[in-house]
Amino acid sequence: LSTLNTHNLPLLRLVYLEREDLVAVHVDDLNNQANQLDQKLDGGLLPQGHAPHWLMNAHSLFYLTRLLVAQCRAPKGMLVVLPAGVAHWCLNDGKHYLDNPR
């Protein structure tokens, strides 16, 4: 992945690896989704006590991502390897849910 980052790929958001069940996602995208999720939770748009387990798991993932960013262990533009299903939720299904919580 560090080699990929030196090959001028800042606009490439999703990189499929040799293993189909793993993908590389830009840490910037995860960080942006984390901020959106926090705003929805803080604004009371999502029921905190009754949030689905997958939503809380995503929140944990986003929190860890932001922790890595804050500690400069995941610099801007870095690619993070995730299971394909998790990456798909973070960048697609999760965004749809956050935009349409009801």
UniProtKB/Swiss-Prot annotation:
Keyword hit for Transport: no
A GO term, aspect molecular function: IgE binding
Swiss-Prot/TrEMBL keywords: Allergen, IgE-binding protein, Seed storage protein, Storage protein
Function: Seed storage protein.
Family as reported in the entry's similarity comment: Belongs to the 11S seed storage protein (globulins) family.
Stated name of the protein: Legumin-like protein Mac i 2
Organism (species): Macadamia integrifolia
